[in-house]
């Protein structure tokens, strides 16, 4: 179900961007930094990479010139390439990011990353895989085959790239177009692993990435503001809560196994009862750290009042909130979005039972950046490569 994730690129110096503290310390030891200085030097370099967002080792003013020169001779701070940036009429931004090649056969995989600004927050939706194995029938990403896992460094680099584009490092200027939060001083306040891929099929790299994203001396995002979404990879859920400490979101979308088998085929392996048992024992779940259940509203498929009442019954005893997601269309999609009055009635039933049931406002539909619409250009690149190979 998973694919290996790379750490270094071919033909270039390895990038330290995205490295954990341990990996950064190992990199410094490998170029001759004395053991007694490793901890101090790691803290210095870490601060420059993740707090200041530097692109060159030469800008590390409190690090000696000799070490800066040695670092530059052996490592880089290379970022992925932003192939395109689209800005929606509602201020949502979507970046197509091309990752450096990892071997001679790799032509540069691509992922999509989405920024959703609101008045009081800015949410970055990041990817954990190139493509996906799950083939959820309502999701555009599910129509793209899995290419490979992203490394922890590639996951972290999505936030670094986004912060650069939004002027969110010292000395950078925010963009003039689009929207940014008007309350507070941080354009990116939340991260959701709801982009391309199933995060729990890339658990080790997601866990490592969360440790970098949440480090208080660098990128400094609270783990309570990092949400990992899963379609229900039950064996990894407990470990996610215990080792990553992030918030959990579950892509539920149905209250009957026969329907969920079609919408989320993973349900055949981990049916609803098994999934909800794992939610009940999720480490740290409480009224202050509720599990989010995502429920896409599909016209005449899963949107009846009876299904709303069954959802309430299923979630009894779980600290939960339910995000109702109007279906976002994509080319060739086999579903339609529920009528608005149907969505509101469903929401009212759930809310009156004591569960928060916000209806997610569709964002970025005009640039295919909304929930369920992401699909990279990697497949097109591979198709072109095959055609070139046949010439």
Swiss-Prot record:
It is found in: Cytoplasm. [4Fe-4S] cluster binds at residues 132, 136, 139. Residues 118-368 form the Radical SAM core domain. Binds 1 [4Fe-4S] cluster. The cluster is coordinated with 3 cysteines and an exchangeable S-adenosyl-L-methionine. It is an enzyme of class 2 (transferase). GO terms for biological process: rRNA base methylation; tRNA methylation. Its cofactor is [4Fe-4S] cluster. It comes from the Bacteria. GO terms for molecular function: 4 iron, 4 sulfur cluster binding; metal ion binding; rRNA (adenine(2503)-C2-)-methyltransferase activity; rRNA binding; tRNA (adenine(37)-C2)-methyltransferase activity; tRNA binding. GO terms for cellular component: cytoplasm. Keywords: 4Fe-4S, Cytoplasm, Disulfide bond, Iron, Iron-sulfur, Metal-binding, Methyltransferase, rRNA processing, S-adenosyl-L-methionine, Transferase, tRNA processing. The active site is at 112 (proton acceptor), 371 (s-methylcysteine intermediate). Its main location: cytoplasm. InterPro entries: Aldolase_TIM, Methyltransferase_A, RlmN_N, RNA_MTrfase_RlmN, rRNA_lsu_MTrfase_RlmN/Cfr, rSAM. Reaction proceeds by a ping-pong mechanism involving intermediate methylation of a conserved cysteine residue. Specifically methylates position 2 of adenine 2503 in 23S rRNA and position 2 of adenine 37 in tRNAs. m2A2503 modification seems to play a crucial role in the proofreading step occurring at the peptidyl transferase center and thus would serve to optimize ribosomal fidelity. This is Dual-specificity RNA methyltransferase RlmN. It comes from Beijerinckia indica subsp. indica (strain ATCC 9039 / DSM 1715 / NCIMB 8712).
């Amino acid at each position: 179900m998973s694919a290996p994730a790379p750490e270094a690129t071919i033909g270039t110096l390895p990038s330290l961007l995205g490295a954990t503290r341990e990996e950064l310390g190992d990199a410094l030891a490998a170029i001759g930094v004395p053991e007694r200085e490793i901890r101090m030097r790691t803290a210095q370099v870490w601060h420059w990479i993740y707090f200041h967002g530097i692109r060159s080792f030469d800008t590390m003013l409190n690090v000696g010139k000799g070490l800066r020169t040695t670092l530059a001779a052996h490592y880089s701070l290379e970022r992925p390439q932003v192939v395109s940036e689209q800005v929606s009429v509602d201020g949502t931004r979507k970046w197509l990011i091309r990752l450096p090649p990892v071997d001679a056969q790799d032509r540069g995989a691509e992922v999509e990353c989405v920024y959703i600004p609101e008045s009081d927050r800015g949410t970055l939706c990041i990817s954990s895989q190139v493509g996906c194995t799950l083939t959820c029938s309502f999701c555009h990403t599910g129509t793209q085959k899995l290419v490979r896992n992203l490394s922890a460094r590639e996951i972290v680099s999505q936030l670094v790239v986004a912060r650069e584009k939004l002027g969110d490092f010292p000395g950078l200027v925010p963009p003039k177009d689009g929207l940014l939060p008007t309350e507070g001083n941080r354009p990116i306040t939340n991260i959701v692993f709801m982009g391309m891929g199933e995060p729990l099929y890339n658990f080790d790299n997601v866990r490592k990435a969360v440790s970098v994203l949440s480090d208080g001396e660098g990128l400094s995002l609270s783990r309570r503001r990092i949400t990992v979404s899963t379609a229900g990879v039950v064996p990894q859920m407990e470990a996610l809560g215990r080792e990553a400490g992030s918030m959990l979101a579950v892509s539920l979308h149905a209250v009957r196994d026969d329907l969920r088998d079609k919408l989320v085929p993973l349900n055949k392996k981990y049916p609803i009862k098994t999934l909800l048992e794992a939610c009940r024992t999720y480490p740290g779940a409480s009224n202050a750290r509720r599990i989010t259940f995502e429920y896409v509203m599909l016209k005449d498929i899963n949107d009846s009042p009876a299904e709303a009442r069954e959802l309430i019954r299923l979630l009894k005893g779980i600290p939960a909130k339910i995000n109702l997601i109007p279906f976002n269309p994509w080319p060739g999609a086999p579903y339609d979005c529920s009528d608005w009055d149907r969505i509101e009635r469903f929401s009212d039933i759930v809310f009156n039972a004591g569960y928060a049931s916000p209806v997610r406002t569709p964002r970025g539909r005009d640039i295919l950046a909304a929930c369920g619409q992401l699909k990279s250009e990697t497949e097109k690149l591979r198709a072109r490569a095959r055609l070139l190979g046949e010439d």
